């Protein structure tokens, strides 16, 4: 799967996460902003990484701004951003979730 454009999914509202995805060249790089990064940062990054790998993306840059999202929300927002970035949103791959 190839990133064709920079894409965003999610909001900056409470209990949500905003994911911005763009083309990368050296693996999955995540820039995470979160008030709970110290406690949950590793888990948030793990969920994002696993979702991207299941979707077939290995070289991407992620800017994630977390506002207390649950894992299911993180997965859904990551998948939505990935589908927009690869321009495949008309063919949802819900098995990734």
From Swiss-Prot:
Its main location: cytoplasm. GO terms for cellular component: cytoplasm. The modification O-(phosphoribosyl dephospho-coenzyme A)serine is found at residue 14. Keywords: Cytoplasm, Phosphoprotein. It comes from the Bacteria. It is found in: Cytoplasm. Belongs to the CitD family. Covalent carrier of the coenzyme of citrate lyase. Oligomer with a subunit composition of (alpha,beta,gamma)6. This is Citrate lyase acyl carrier protein.
């Amino acid at each position: 799967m190839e990133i064709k454009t920079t894409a965003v999914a999610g909001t900056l509202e409470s209990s949500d996460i905003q994911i911005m995805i763009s083309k990368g060249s050296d693996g999955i790089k995540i820039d995470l902003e979160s008030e709970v990064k110290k406690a949950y940062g590793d888990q948030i990054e793990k969920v994002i990484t696993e979702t991207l790998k299941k979707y077939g993306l290995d070289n991407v840059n992620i800017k994630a701004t977390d506002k207390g999202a649950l894992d299911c929300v993180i997965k859904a927002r990551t998948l939505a951003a990935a589908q927009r970035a690869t321009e495949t949103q008309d063919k949802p791959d819900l098995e990734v979730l």
